Amino acid sequence: MNLNFMPLLHAYNHASIDFHFNSSARDFCVHEVPLYEFSNTGEHAVIQVRKSGLSTLEMLQVFSQILGVRIAELGYAGLKDKNALTTQFVSLPKKYAPLLEKNTHNLQERNLKILSLNYHHNKIKLGHLKGNRFFMRFKKMTPLNAQKTEQVLEQIVQFGMPNYFGSQRFGKFNDNHQEGLKILQNQTKFAHQKLNAFLISSYQSYLFNSLLSKRLEISKIISAFSLKENLEFFKQKNLSVDSNTLKTLKNQAHPFKILEGDVMCHYPYGKFFDALELEKESERFLKKEVVPTGLLDGKKALYAKNLSFEIEKEFRHNLLSSHAKTLGSRRFFWVFAENVTSQYIKEKAQFELGFYLPKGSYASALLKEIKHEKGENNDEF
């Protein structure tokens, strides 16, 4: 497989929308929504922290330096952007809580502010969040482009959007996935096991994005072409699909088509199950009750069946499925932005956007779907 970055298809077919977005503390805000309410009792202090100009890992290092707490004793639910104003929850042993107020000034000098203090009986672990609320400010936006943006948002609210991994997953030079494959091939290795695991996960993410883009391509072809043309297309791809199945696929109202054998999942969380009754599952998908999932390959990954598997297998790698420390999983192909709010400020030529996404989903994926950056070919089947 070609490991160079290829344009990823969009869900919707509008032309590129021209505006400026700067990922900065003024124009990009991220607020973590916790998975559960904190009990206000227990051996772990839980602080809500506001930061800017620091990555989550850099923030943890600051806490370690100022409070004397070991980084391993600190708990957090997820990584937050460096170039943004972000809030997130961090847990630390209760004994360090009195030091927080004493070091308020020292923390503020490092762009950290404690917004609240609570207590809980367990340490916060990775993944212990519901999702994130986002705010983005777009600049140099004309009234016409603001109108176009509103129209795209209406589609996203109605149908959702592709759940692509964001570019930050792949590093400054977009080569993390290549390093991950080299680790699997025993061509390179780093001293820190967490770094090795992260780079391997970047390769998983690259395969997932590529599979999702391929599925969007197939969905667009099913929608755009006649039954006869579709039969010829699937025949050329050595994919076995009969005319009755194709009719069912064309009748699906959602732009992302559910295929026989897809691994579905209840949304926003729940159990996996196989898509066997396509008409029924496509209706539930429209209602945002279930979502098809894509492969994050690994030793214990759950694989699709039938037609879905025939497409998915091109995005597997035997080194992932045999790697002892890479268990594998599945990820929503599609997510739904919630609580979407927008405002166009004509005199400033600015467009303000707020929305909520479930954990693991990227604001940059929504930005990509709105903007349709020039040079990204969305019509190439």
UniProtKB/Swiss-Prot annotation:
Q: What class of enzyme is it?
A: isomerase
- Catalyses which reaction(s): uridine(13) in tRNA = pseudouridine(13) in tRNA
Q: Locate the active site.
A: D81
Q: Where is the TRUD domain?
A: 160-335
The alphabetized UniProt keywords are:
Isomerase, tRNA processing
EC number(s) reported in the record:
5.4.99.27
The entry assigns this protein to a family as follows: Belongs to the pseudouridine synthase TruD family.
The UniProt entry, under HAMAP family, shows:
TruD
- Protein task: Responsible for synthesis of pseudouridine from uracil-13 in transfer RNAs.
Name recorded for this polypeptide: tRNA pseudouridine synthase D
Q: Which organism is it from?
A: Helicobacter pylori (strain HPAG1)
